[in-house]
Amino acid sequence: MSDTVTKVVADLNAAILQKSARAIAEVACKYSASDREKVRAQYRSTYSIEPDDHINKMLKGGDAATIVSNCWDELPVLRAKHLSKALKGSVDHRALLDLLIMCDREDWNNTVVAFTQQFRKNLPEELEKALKSTTSYRAFYTTWIKFDRAPRNNINGDALKLKEAFSKKDEQTVFDIMSTTVESEYKAIATQFEKVAGMTMIQAFAALTSGPLYWALHTAHYRNIGMNNGAAFLIHHACTADKKGDIARMTRLSPLLCDKCLNAKNYYSEFGDMGKDIVNAFKDAVEEVLKVLWRV
C-alpha cells in the first residue's frame, strides 16, 4: 500500500461523509483485501465504528451502499454470511458458484473458521446437509472443497482419462480431475481433450449432466483456466441472464474478487465488453460503483 493507513482512513471517512457510494468505491478499488483490512482496523480505532457500519448509517441502504459497505467488511465473515443465506431453505445454486467455485484454499479455510464463529456450525457439514437430496451435485462440491490441487505433469494422460470418464458417464473421475488440476495445466488438458475427444469440455459437460451440476462444472472450467476468467464468466451471466441484471451476484462477487481479478475486464472480451454490459444491465449508482470496482 503506497499511502499510509492513516491517510486512507481519512480518505475513506471523507468519502463516507460525502454520502457518495462512488467515492467510497474509488477508495476501495485501490487496495487489496489485506490492505483494506488494515484500514478497517484503523478506522474502527479512530472513529469507534466499523467502516461498513458507518457506510450503512450514512447512505441509508440501497444496492450501491450494500456493495461498497461489503468492500469494507471482514471478507471471510462476509463469505460465511453469504453461504449461510445460500444454504437456508431452497439452495441458492448461483450463490454457490460465486462463493465456492470462486474460492481458493486460504479463502475457504478462513471462511470455515468464520462460519463456525458466526453460526456455531461446521460449514462442510452444513453444505452436505443442504445438498443431501442431490447425490452427484453434492459429490462434486464435496470433492471441490477439499482444495487439494497439485501438478500431475501428464496432460495427454489426463485428457484421455477425461475422454474415457465422459464416455462411461463416470462423474466422480470428472469431479476429481476438475477439482485437483492446477491452473498451469488445466487449459492444456482442456485443449488436448478437445483434440482426442472431438468435443469441447463444455459440450462434454452438457452431454454428461444438466441443471445446477452442469453450471457448476461450466463455471469450474473457467475458474480452472484462471480466476480472472471465472470472474469474467460469472459477471457476463450477471449482466445478461436476467432482464434487470443479477444484482445479488454482483453484490457477492465485487467485494470478494475485485482486487484479485484485476484483469477480468480483459478476459471478458470472450463474451463482449464488460463496461457496456454493466451499463445495459444496471442503473444509476449501482452501475457507477460496479464500473469503478471492476475498472471499466
UniProtKB/Swiss-Prot annotation:
- What is the superkingdom listed in this entry's lineage? Eukaryota
| Swiss-Prot/TrEMBL keywords | Annexin, Cytoplasm, Cytoskeleton, Microtubule, Repeat
Q: What is a single Pfam family found in this protein's UniProt entry?
A: ANXE1_4th
Keyword Transferase attached = no
* Chief subcellular location: cytoplasm
Q: Where are the Annexin repeats?
A: 3-72, 74-146, 153-222, 226-295
What Gene Ontology cellular component terms go with this record? cytoplasm; microtubule; plasma membrane
InterPro entries on file: Alpha_giardin, Annexin_repeat, Annexin_sf
Q: Which residues form the signal peptide?
A: none
Q: Name one GO biological process term.
A: cytoskeleton organization
User: What are this entry's molecular-function GO terms?
Assistant: calcium ion binding; calcium-dependent phospholipid binding; phosphatidylserine binding
Q: Which Gene3D superfamilies match?
A: Annexin
Q: Can you say where in the cell this protein is located? A: Cytoplasm, Cytoskeleton
The UniProt family comment states: Belongs to the annexin family. Giardin subunit alpha subfamily.
- State what this protein does: Giardins are involved in parasite attachment to the intestinal mucosa and in the cytoskeletal disassembly and reassembly that marks the transition from infectious trophozoite to transmissible cyst. They may interact with other cytoskeletal proteins such as microtubules in the microribbons or crossbridges, to maintain the integrity of the ventral disk.
User: What is this protein's name?
Assistant: Giardin subunit alpha-3
Organism equals: Giardia intestinalis (Giardia lamblia)
